[in-house]
Structures are given as structure tokens and as C-alpha cells.
Amino acid sequence: MPALPILDPADLPADAVEVGRIADAWGVKGWFKVLPYSADPEALFSSKRWYLQPSEKGAKSFFTGTVLLPIRQAREHSDSVVAQAQGVDDRDAAEALRGARIFVPRSSFPTAAEDEYYWVDLIGLEVVNREGVALGSVRELLATGPQTTLVLSFPQEGGKEGERMIPFVSAFVDRVDIAGRRIVVDWQPDY
């Protein structure tokens, strides 16, 4: 297998977003199976340049630092994605990538449909209610069955951090302003 280019960590794009990980080799011709972190893997398909980093959990890998992986093709297969990359030509090479974390530039994501948002764009947004009362900032989002839930962090007395959960549905969310870094909701602080 030809050596994959090793990039300096500074070469990871500033807008890089972790979108999945390589699960295992798939077949004998260098294909590998990817577990995307999203139900919609379009971000993986839209970028032909994936940046890999070794797993934080210590998966064995032949590389350290950041590796640029030029993608020949990627497609959905069952509940995952399979991909083929330049320089990964056999099963052994694909197995060497097992556990690697996949990053793509946020700028390569396809445009979201109206009233749809990438979770990564919502993290850190300030959430206020209709009266302008600050409820916290989005720390994470949870897929809770039929809906997504915003998990907010807010300061409490004594320096502790509080947590608030708000369903991310139109019944409670009035407006999302990505550019203004704000979400307006129909919610009260004491809910």
C-alpha cells in the first residue's frame, strides 16, 4: 500500500467537523465501512477529501496526526456507508484505518433545506424565550425518538452549571437565527 500523506494537525481545516468513524474493512478491494454520526450522511458524500485522525480510544493504526484521504467513491449500504479511497487498495490497507475518526470541512456540507439545520450549527447558540429572557446556550442535541431535544447549559448561583431540555419542535421553537446566533422559544425558565 502506498503511504498515505501525514498532515500536520494545523492542516485540519478550521471548520472541520467530525462526521463519523471507520468501522472496518469491507470486501477485499480496499473498501471500508463507515459509521456516520448522522442519519443523513450527505456530508460524507459531498466531500471528496476526508481528514482522518486516530481514534481517541487507542485503536491501532499505522498513522499518527491528521491524514488527508482522497475519496474515490462513497455510497450508502444498509445502515452504514461504504467508501473507497485513493491509496487504500486492499483489505489490509482498509483494516489499518479501523477506528479512525472522519472529519470534513463544514463548508463542504450541502445546503440544508428550509427549516432544517445541522446540529453542529446549533451548538453554542443562545436560547431566549419570547420575552427575551435568556434560558442558556445549546450544549448538545439529543435524538429522543420522534423528536430532537436541545440540551441547554446556564449558570446557576454558586457557580454551578444548570441544565435545561427543550424539545426542538415547531410547537416550542419560534425562530432559529444562525447568523444572529440565537434561538427564540416559547418556554419559561421554571419549566
Curated annotation (Swiss-Prot):
Q: Which Gene3D superfamilies match?
A: PRC-barrel domain, RimM
Keyword rRNA processing included in the entry's annotation: yes
The record, for InterPro entries, names: PRC_barrel-like_sf, PRC_RimM, RimM, RimM_N, RimM_N_sf, Transl_B-barrel_sf
Q: Which residues does the UniProt record annotate as the domain PRC barrel?
A: 114-191
Q: Which GO terms describe its molecular function?
A: ribosome binding
- The keyword rRNA processing belongs to this UniProt entry's keyword annotation: yes
Top-level division of the source organism's lineage: Bacteria
Pfam name, any one:
PRC_RimM
Keywords tagged on the record: Chaperone, Cytoplasm, Ribosome biogenesis, rRNA processing
Location comes to:
Cytoplasm
Its GO CC terms are: cytoplasm; ribosome
Where primarily located? cytoplasm
Biological process, per Gene Ontology: ribosomal small subunit biogenesis; rRNA processing
Family under the similarity heading: Belongs to the RimM family.
Domain description: The PRC barrel domain binds ribosomal protein uS19.
**Subunit relationships:** Binds ribosomal protein uS19.
Q: What does this protein do?
A: An accessory protein needed during the final step in the assembly of 30S ribosomal subunit, possibly for assembly of the head region. Essential for efficient processing of 16S rRNA. May be needed both before and after RbfA during the maturation of 16S rRNA. It has affinity for free ribosomal 30S subunits but not for 70S ribosomes.
Q: Which NCBIfam families match?
A: 16S_RimM
This protein is called what? Ribosome maturation factor RimM
